């Protein structure tokens, strides 16, 4: 392997005595590039190529979900937020055979929660936005059946946050402080969540909104606009997206791949 060793001068402190010791630490071998732009790994010449990956942003898709017991089809319309770094959030409008239309969301790929619980957790409850959900349901009347059932479930923002926490971390005792911290860290903390400038531009274009490109975390208005488009699609208004279209893909360059490796090294 054509490489060079990496050594780091490290300083260690004894927590009990306060003694400080400095020494050189071997961190590993770093592959070296040849003058032809290739690498030699275990005697084999290799090259790093760019990757075609899903672009960050929001994607609206139709679909069908099957229940394994009776293989009955559930008609779906989904709106999924794909960040550059962080947890996905998937919202859906579902039509079960012979039952009311329901809208829900999966936060951090956990169990499905009611869409009304998510909206209340974002601050669209009676205390912060009086009458908002009633007006929302009047506009999308096919959700009236679900609204009548969910009206009294986690009716405040605090109770909605606790409900999401219990779904995401079953078995752990929920407190309002930990529930708020978890919800914020998932989508509204720049250290854990990054939509990227490209993702923000694509989301602005898809949602027909104007938000600064440097706003790389989610806003509650983003989620609300996604919900509105998703239920519009269920009502027959608007167009779905083609996930395989090249407009929904991007090139991950060699420089970005190396950047991610350096970031991993820094975190160590």
What are these regions (language model features)?
Residues 1-265:
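N-terminal non-catalytic structural scaffold regions of very large proteins
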């Amino acid at each position: 392997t054509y490489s060079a060793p990496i050594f780091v001068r490290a300083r260690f402190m004894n927590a009990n005595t306060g003694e400080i010791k400095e020494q050189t630490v071997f961190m590993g071998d770093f592959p070296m590039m040849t003058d032809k732009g290739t690498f030699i790994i275990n005697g084999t010449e290799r090259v790093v190529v760019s990757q075609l990956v899903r672009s960050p942003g929001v994607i609206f898709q139709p679909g069908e979900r099957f229940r394994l017991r009776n293989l009955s089809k559930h008609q779906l319309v989904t709106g999924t937020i794909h960040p550059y770094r962080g947890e996905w959030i998937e919202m859906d409008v579902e039509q079960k055979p012979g039952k009311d239309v329901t809208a829900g969301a999966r936060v951090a790929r956990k169990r499905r929660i009611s869409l009304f619980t998510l909206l209340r957790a974002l601050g669209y409850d009676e205390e912060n936005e009086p009458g908002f959900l009633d007006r929302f349901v009047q506009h999308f009347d096919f959700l009236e059946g679900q609204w009548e059932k969910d009206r009294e479930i986690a009716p405040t923002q605090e109770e909605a946050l606790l409900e999401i926490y219990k779904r995401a971390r079953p078995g752990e005792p929920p407190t309002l402080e930990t529930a708020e911290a978890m919800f914020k860290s998932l989508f509204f903390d720049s250290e854990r969540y990054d939509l990227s400038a490209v993702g923000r531009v694509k989301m602005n274009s898809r949602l027909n909104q104007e938000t600064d490109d440097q706003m790389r975390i989610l806003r509650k208005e983003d989620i609300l606009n996604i919900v509105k488009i998703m239920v519009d699609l269920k009502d027959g208004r608007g167009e779905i997206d083609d996930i395989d279209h090249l407009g929904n893909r991007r090139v991950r360059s060699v420089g970005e791949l190396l950047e991610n490796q350096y970031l991993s090294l820094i975190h160590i």
